[in-house]
């Protein structure tokens, strides 16, 4: 690991298991766990031991490749049917992050013409590893493209964690901050805590500090005051799914930041790879929004903080309409207007996606 980049990887492929950084333990402990079965992988995704759209996709791809090694048949058609069943099981872990389905579908395409079970098993492993390799370069390029939007001295706000541990390396929304550090550009980050699971407080501040990036933590309800008093230059966030018209689903609270940024005339950017786009989804109204366990809101670290019988509404994501977005930063460039047309053109140029 390079001296200027000290953030551990969130997921790695091993000979007979998957090694993950348990993000539920951060920042108090840095704990790595081994996943051996598809059930282990499913549980790790559902319980947020692994989270972040690209990291979820990589982990699921590894999970499919790993589980396929245990399929006992020499019939390639039977093998493919069992792989499809594993794919459908893993795909049900989280409904909003489109990278999950994208990665699994990519593995299925890889073995469409496989002549033997052994060849298919090898191909699945190679393709899953290739997804991780490509994601690192994709994130680095997103960071390079985003960096041109900022100058030394800028104060930038973010929410949730769209960083290195949410991807293979660097992250999406946080990628420019690591690259800025390497180039000695002075950027200061304001990280919203991100209730109720506190990904901003627990993960973003932790990894930015690991990487030597200047960061200040704020509570979510301090965002407006901070934008005004600290003269925030821009807001940059990640995304879990982007519709064809540019509407973007991201962690709950993102929409609030976009509305506030519009009020204060602050640029609001989404940073995401092309694999996060779902061109089959016309607009944000068609994006499924995951609702999570009410205990995430009623308890903190096992301690009750609300009446046990109170009703809870706990959506994990919200959708920011494209008209509130100043630009979508991808590995292929920055989309700044006419989102449907530009997204269509982008995918026409990259038909393999």
From Swiss-Prot:
Presence of keyword Isomerase: yes
Active site as annotated: 240 (proton donor)
Site (Transition state stabilizer) location in chain: 160
One BP annotation, GO: L-methionine salvage from methylthioadenosine
Binding site for substrate: 51-53, 94, 199, 250-251
Keyword terms: Amino-acid biosynthesis, Isomerase, Methionine biosynthesis
Catalytic function, reaction form: 5-(methylsulfanyl)-alpha-D-ribose 1-phosphate = 5-(methylsulfanyl)-D-ribulose 1-phosphate
Disulfide-linked positions: none
Recorded metabolic or biological pathway in which this protein acts: Amino-acid biosynthesis; L-methionine biosynthesis via salvage pathway; L-methionine from S-methyl-5-thio-alpha-D-ribose 1-phosphate: step 1/6
Keyword Isomerase: yes
EC number: 5.3.1.23
GO molecular function, one term: S-methyl-5-thioribose-1-phosphate isomerase activity
HAMAP family noted in UniProt: Salvage_MtnA
PANTHER family: METHYLTHIORIBOSE-1-PHOSPHATE ISOMERASE
Record's function text: Catalyzes the interconversion of methylthioribose-1-phosphate (MTR-1-P) into methylthioribulose-1-phosphate (MTRu-1-P).
Family per record: Belongs to the eIF-2B alpha/beta/delta subunits family. MtnA subfamily.
UniProt name for this protein: Methylthioribose-1-phosphate isomerase
């Amino acid at each position: 690991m390079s001296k200027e980049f000290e953030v551990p990887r969130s997921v790695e492929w091993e000979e007979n298991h998957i090694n993950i950084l348990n993000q539920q333990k951060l920042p108090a402990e840095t704990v790595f766990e081994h996943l051996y079965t598809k059930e282990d992988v499913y549980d790790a995704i559902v319980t947020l031991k692994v989270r972040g759209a690209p990291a979820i996709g990589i982990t699921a791809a590894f999970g499919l490749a790993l589980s396929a090694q245990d399929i006992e048949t020499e019939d390639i058609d039977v093998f493919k049917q069992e792989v499809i069943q594993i794919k459908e099981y893993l795909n049900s872990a989280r409904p909003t992050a489109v990278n999950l389905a994208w990665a699994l579908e990519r593995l299925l395409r890889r073995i469409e013409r496989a002549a033997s079970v052994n060849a298919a098993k090898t191909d699945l492993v190679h393709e899953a590893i290739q997804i991780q390799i490509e994601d690192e370069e994709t994130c680095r390029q997103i960071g390079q493209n985003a960096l041109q939007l900022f100058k030394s001295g800028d104060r930038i706000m973010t929410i949730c964690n769209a960083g290195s541990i949410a991807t293979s390396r660097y992250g999406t929304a946080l990628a420019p901050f690591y690259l800025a550090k390497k180039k000695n550009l002075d950027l200061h980050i304001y990280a919203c805590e991100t209730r109720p699971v506190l990904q901003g407080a627990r993960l973003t501040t932790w990894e930015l500090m690991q990487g030597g990036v200047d960061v200040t933590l704020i509570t979510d309800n301090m965002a407006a005051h901070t934008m005004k008093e600290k003269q925030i230059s821009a807001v940059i966030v990640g995304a879990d799914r982007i519709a064809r018209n540019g509407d973007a689903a991201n962690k709950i609270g993102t929409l609030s930041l976009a509305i506030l940024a519009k009020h204060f005339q602050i640029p609001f950017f989404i940073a995401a790879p092309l694999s996060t786009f779902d061109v089959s989804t016309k607009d944000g109204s068609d994006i499924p929004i995951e609702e999570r366990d009410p205990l995430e809101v009623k308890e903190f670290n096992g301690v009750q903080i609300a009446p046990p019988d109170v009703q809870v509404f706990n959506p994990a994501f919200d959708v920011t309409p494209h008209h509130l977005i100043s630009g979508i930063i991808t590995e292929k460039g920055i989309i700044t207007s006419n989102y449907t047309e530009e997204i269509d053109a982008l995918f026409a140029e990259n038909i393999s996606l």
